[in-house]
Amino acid sequence: MLSRIVTCFLFLLSSLPLFAEEEAAQSKNTFVQPAVMLAIAILFFYFILWRPEQKRRKAMEKRKNDLAKGDKVTAMGIIGTVDDIREHTVILNIASGKVEVLKGAISEILKPNDNKS
């Protein structure tokens, strides 16, 4: 069984140069097709992945900068009301206590008409 596997493997290895020579003879424009595929991939990543994420990030950053006392926010799954805003942190009222949270940890700013319980 092992000898059959080794024989098949050696046969495939010995025939690889034949496939390579045949491919080189068939295609003369080897630069155009990969360049087009690369351009399509770059456009896909830009318009489908990177650009929408950049827009969401800018919108959330603007909302974080516009935070005001009394806004309801979620930070790491905790829902609280903004009590005080500092340079890099926010003080949240949660139940009967206060918690200091980094502005970057705020994941969502709830609108007054949101009913999330």
Swiss-Prot record:
GO terms for biological process: protein transport. Keywords: Cell inner membrane, Cell membrane, Membrane, Protein transport, Translocation, Transmembrane, Transmembrane helix, Transport. It is found in: Cell inner membrane. The chain crosses the membrane at residues 30-50. Pfam families: YajC. Its main location: membrane. InterPro entries: Preprotein_translocase_YajC (IPR003849). Part of the SecDF-YidC-YajC translocase complex. The SecDF-YidC-YajC translocase forms a supercomplex with SecYEG, called the holo-translocon (HTL). The SecYEG-SecDF-YajC-YidC holo-translocon (HTL) protein secretase/insertase is a supercomplex required for protein secretion, insertion of proteins into membranes, and assembly of membrane protein complexes. While the SecYEG complex is essential for assembly of a number of proteins and complexes, the SecDF-YajC-YidC subcomplex facilitates these functions. Belongs to the YajC family. NCBIfam families: yajC (TIGR00739). PANTHER family: SEC TRANSLOCON ACCESSORY COMPLEX SUBUNIT YAJC. This is Sec translocon accessory complex subunit YajC. It comes from Chlamydia pneumoniae (Chlamydophila pneumoniae).
